Regions:
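Structural preference for beta-strand elements that scaffold enzyme active sites
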Residues: 2-4, 29, 60-64, 87-89, ...
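General structural feature for long, well-ordered alpha-helical segments within catalytic domains
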Residues: 4, 16, 72, 76, ...
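Glycine-rich, positively charged N-terminal anion/phosphate-binding segment
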Residues: 8-79
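Glycine-enriched alpha-helix->loop->beta-strand junction motifs that scaffold or abut catalytic
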Residues: 24-28, 84-86, 126
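Non-cysteine beta-strand/loop elements that form the S-adenosyl-L-methionine
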Residues: 32, 85-95
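Glycine-rich, proline-tolerant flexible connector loops at the mouths of alpha/beta enzymes
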Residues: 36-41, 92-112
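Alpha-helix-loop-beta-strand connector modules within alpha/beta enzyme cores
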Residues: 51-62, 106-130
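Short, charged beta->alpha transition segments
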Residues: 74-78, 83, 87-88, 115-122
Length: 130
């Protein structure tokens, strides 16, 4: 059996993950709180702190992206690959009302044609494991 550590908003940042890993370990993958790319390139300070390799040494980290924009997703994947990440998680499960209202997370699932186009584009333009 594999054990995956899912993020809880505002709680399971890199400090918590490191403390948990040092005390308990036995987690196969730690998923980061989501990165939510916008038209502004780069990461917020919080996002950067959560994904910096120096803040996650020895942890099997999977960065998570929350977007419905293929261009932003691909740009963010490339930035994450520059940090050494080769596996990325696309968040299609967040049920938060503010996220769903923007047709992101689980809200993107109801937009089948848009989701199909999005997936076609990201899989054709990215070689990361998604």
């Amino acid at each position: 059996m594999k054990y995956y550590f899912a993020p809880l908003e505002g709680i399971t940042g890199y400090i918590y993950r490191n403390a948990y890993h040092n005390l308990f370990g036995q987690i196969d993958k730690y998923f980061t709180p989501f990165v939510s790319p916008t038209s502004n390139e780069g990461f917020t300070t919080r996002e950067l702190n959560d994904i910096l390799p120096a803040h996650n040494e020895g942890l099997p980290i999977i960065p998570q992206i929350l977007t419905n924009n293929a261009e932003y997703f691909i740009r963010t994947v490339n930035a994450l690959k520059d940090f050494g990440y080769d596996e990325i998680n696309l968040n299609l499960g967040c049920p938060s009302g503010t996220v769903v209202a923007k047709h992101k997370g689980s809200g993107f699932l109801s937009e089948r044609e848009d989701l199909d186009r999005f997936l076609d584009e990201i899989f054709s333009k990215s070689n990361a494991k998604i």
